[in-house]
Amino acid sequence: WIRLVLDRHKFPYTYIRDEDIRMGGLKDRFEVILFGHNYLDLQSQIHGIDKKFGPMPYTKTEKTPHLGVPDASDDITGGIGWTGMVELEKFLNAGGVLITLGNGSALALEGGLVRDVYRKSGAFFTPGSELKTKFLRTDHPLAYGLPEVTSVFRTWMPVYDIARSGRGGVIMQWGTKLRAEDREPEEPEATLTKEAREAKDKAKKEEVKMLVSGALKGEDELEGRPAIFDLPAGQGRVIAFNFNPVHRYLNRSDHRFLWNALLNWNALPPARGQAK
């Protein structure tokens, strides 16, 4: 789906294989690496198809003329492996930009390429929902041309949070309110004056609900959690989306986030917490 979007908009790119990442020298060849959404757990994102099934060629032959496109490999087992993870770390340390989409963000957020981010546990579920979001850094290039409060399409995938010291790296959050644990405790109803009760009722009616369309379970658990990260990694950075802006070429209104990331890769402000 990423290739379809880039091809249709005539956006130039180089398709790279697991072997290309393991080979190293990434910063000598690329400024930005885009890692797409997938439905794999972290182990499978790193190690790919089990090597016990290899070698497993993906090449064009007389018997398989339809294979080997857009690229070929003599063995597609093994994934990028730990060697590839080390090479991605070198790429970031040298100033490269890694952009991860949807569940593909687990590679960076859970794979150790950034710090202070952790998977959030809780009873939340977004099976395919349009949700309200809010930019916390409206001056960031990822927010160019967009209102402070907007909405994006989110399917089911992990939810992440970040240590308080790293929250400057959150560009956009889910919903428009503070996290539940950051809100002031409400006064007991019985202690409120009539005016205070009326003001509370009015505020509740005017409250912006997160769900725009679809289904949502555990809104309070998701409220205020990061939707887009911009995190330091060595001299480089990781732009991690907690949704997939190119979901099957259906959510075209979300392509804007990807374009902002790709077109402004060399105009990003210093990542919060990054050594100068």
Where would I find each of the regions flagged by the language model?
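A generic structural motif
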Residues: 12-21, 119-124, 128-129, 273
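N-terminal beta1-alpha1 cap of cysteine-dependent amidohydrolase-like domains
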Residues: 1-36
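An acidic, glycine-rich "communication" segment
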Residues: 104-210
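Solvent-exposed loop/turn segments at secondary-structure junctions
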Residues: 20-22, 34-42, 98, 104-107, ...
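Short alpha-beta junction capping motif
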Residues: 30-107, 235, 241, 261
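Short secondary-structure boundary/capping segments
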Residues: 48-52, 113-118, 255-257
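Extracellular ligand-binding/catalytic regions of CAZymes and related secreted enzymes
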Residues: 7-9, 15-17, 141, 147, ...
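Stable alpha-helical elements in mature extracytoplasmic
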Residues: 2, 84, 104, 138, ...
